[in-house]
């Protein structure tokens, strides 16, 4: 196959959903390329084109409200010469007001545009089963391609600090999630003055109202370099259960696991489908359990080590070097 990817973002979803799988497919005899979304992108001879989040409303030319006619015309024109794959890893129809992209997606014009682009695709690929259950109403030809990691992540030696570190990484859209664990984290810091807390990405430290400073590191522009910033001994993955959050993937817990980090995560999809409670980490069902589970891990180094090793073993089953065949089969199905 000759496959071309068109991505809305270079890192994050762009890395996991477009660049990483296409790079791996290139290692197995397929000709692949990718570039940022724009309505002047051409096929360059590709027989499969994968478009991430095509359509909608934004200030960007590729998806702007004033450009919807151009985008739709461009997308339909590609249909004449290649199999069309619409790639989606979030539900654009259930974006929450706290999300910075709320004004971009939550309007009738954006919804109609996204639906139109999905409807004319030969295949829609999504990252989770829940997302597939929703999008199948728009296009019945759906393939679930769950997020994978590069095998090299399993051998990354994370930085180790003198003080035990509890950590979290995420974007501004997770503000409600941090709120769910803030009390437990604050209580844990008060009881354990000799530990550190480290946030990577959005600066949501103010949500915790911590008794002392929480260390903060801004996002790294390269996904592979971002992995090297993670110095956590314990990872947290809070997630407020909402209609939008239900479609999220397990990638945060998978990243922690690959680095041998036990996780304390909210007992909701997607995390409960990946984290093995009591084996690779803990699943929290009630707010007070955050402090309890963190205390157990802080006080038991042997448990942290065992859970971390179990987590890494689990993560080894989720490498793109094994999982690329799912992308290969999905794309071949529409040729």
Name each model-derived stretch.
Residues 74-78, 92, 104-124:
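Membrane-proximal helix-turn-helix segments that form the acceptor-binding/catalytic region
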Residues 49, 79-96:
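Active-site proximal beta-strand in glycosyltransferases
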């Amino acid at each position: 196959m000759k496959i071309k990817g068109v991505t809305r973002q270079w890192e994050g979803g762009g890395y996991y959903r477009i660049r990483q799988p296409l790079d791996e497919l290139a290692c197995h005899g397929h000709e692949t390329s990718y570039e940022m979304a724009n309505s002047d992108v051409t096929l360059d001879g590709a027989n499969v084109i994968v478009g991430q989040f095509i359509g909608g409303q934004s200030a960007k030319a590729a998806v702007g409200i004033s450009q919807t006619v151009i985008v739709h015309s461009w997308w339909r024109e590609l249909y004449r010469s290649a199999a069309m794959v619409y790639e989606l890893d979030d539900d654009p129809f259930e974006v929450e007001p706290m999300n910075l992209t709320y004004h971009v997606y939550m309007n009738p014009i954006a919804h109609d545009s996204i639906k139109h682009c999905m409807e004319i695709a030969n295949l829609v690929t999504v990252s989770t089963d829940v997302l597939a259950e929703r999008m199948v109403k728009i296009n019945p030809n759906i393939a679930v391609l769950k997020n994978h990691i590069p095998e090299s992540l399993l051998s990354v030696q994370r930085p180790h600090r003198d003080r035990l570190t509890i950590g979290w990484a995420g974007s501004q859209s997770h503000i409600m999630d941090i709120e769910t664990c803030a009390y437990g984290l604050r209580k844990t810091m008060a009881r354990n003055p000799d530990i550190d807390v480290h946030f990577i990405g959005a600066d949501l430290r103010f949500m915790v109202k911590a008794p002392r400073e929480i260390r903060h590191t801004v996002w790294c522009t390269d996904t592979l370099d971002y992995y090297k910033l993670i110095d956590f001994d314990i990872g947290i993955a809070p997630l407020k259960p909402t209609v939008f959050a239900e479609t999220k993937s397990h990638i945060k817990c998978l990243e922690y696991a690959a680095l041998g980090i036990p996780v304390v995560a909210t007992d909701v999809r997607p995390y409960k489908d990946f984290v093995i409670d009591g084996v690779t980490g803990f699943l929290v069902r009630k707010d007070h359990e955050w402090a309890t589970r963190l205390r157990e891990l802080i006080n038991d180094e042997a448990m942290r080590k065992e859970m971390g090793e179990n987590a890494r073993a689990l993560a080894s089953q989720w490498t793109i070097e094994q999982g690329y065949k799912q992308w290969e089969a999905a794309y071949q199905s529409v040729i």
